Amino acid sequence: MNLNSTPKICFIIGMMPRTGTNWAYDILMQSNHTGNIGPIWEDNLLNHVETLESAAKKIASSWDSKWKADHQKIEVLRLTESLQKNFELGLEKFVHQQFLTSSCEADNPTYLILKSPNAWHIKPPKTLLQRNKCIILTRNPHDLIASGMASFGWGLFGACNRYIESTKAIVQLNDSCNQCLTISFEDLKENLCESVQQLYNYLDISLPSFDFSSLAVRGKSPTKKNEKMTWTAQGITSKEQIQKHKTSKIFMSKIQHMVVSELCITAGKSLGYSFGAQKTPNVVRWGIRAAFRLFCFVRKLKG
């Protein structure tokens, strides 16, 4: 397959659910230059590079020391890089083949848009993003975790741990592939027009004549028996809604906000978010840290 003559791929990766993955996807799908591949195949596709590393390490670690093959262990790990490049090429071909058999409305799109609300375990690609594009969506930890707890029933410590690990993956991805575009949920909500223009400029495609404030945004909530919900962008981007949100502490208690502040402040700052002075008493902070370490230890034991 000649990759130069096929559409490029734009991966939309939300650091976690509730970061606006569907929103950004729907914004870009209003263009005649974008297409999809039918089913949402991309969800977790980029996460499987870790499987290659695990397989290589598992093979090498099983070798008996009597074989004196330590130097071969290094070669096996180097082989992983070659496997990863081939894996990425195969993934790219897979996406294009799915496009050829799907009911994409655009006959010859410039980009195929794929989305995934899951940055955890993503490894920086070796060559995939040299030919394609990647949009990363972030959100401040308080609102993201509160929204996830309300919509998906997340546990507080588990959500904080996932936020921290997803942030590490995003920072590593950005450091390795500086051609990625990062947009926050707050940007979409508070500066919709500018954010839409930024998305289209990034893909170098023309902005369609469309009222993006009236765009229907889709989602669903497992805590409501997977009930599908639709709302318009205007419903969350109006000045009244933004001010209402800023003056209310949604979904979480004061102590829960303390936990998020204590555990996720470093991760949030690395994504560009700013926080007020920490007012939590030291004894409470130590207790939160100790409980979180115990949670992570027990979780690791359970595998």
Predicted features and spans:
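Alpha-helical packing segments of well-folded alpha/beta enzyme cores
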Residues: 98, 166-170, 195, 256, ...
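Walker A (P-loop) phosphate-binding motif
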Residues: 5-22, 26-28
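Cofactor-binding loop segments of dinucleotide-utilizing enzymes, especially the Rossmann-like FAD-
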Residues: 15, 39, 137-139
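PAPS-dependent sulfotransferase catalytic domain
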Residues: 106-210, 223-232, 236, 293-296
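Short gly/pro/ser/thr-enriched loop/turn and capping motifs at secondary-structure boundaries
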Residues: 43-44, 142-145, 214-217
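PAPS-dependent sulfotransferases, especially Golgi type II membrane carbohydrate sulfotransferases
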Residues: 1-10, 205-303
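Soluble or luminal CAZymes and related metallo-dependent hydrolases
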Residues: 83-95, 117-118, 158-166, 191, ...
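PAPS-dependent sulfation machinery
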Residues: 30-115, 120-122
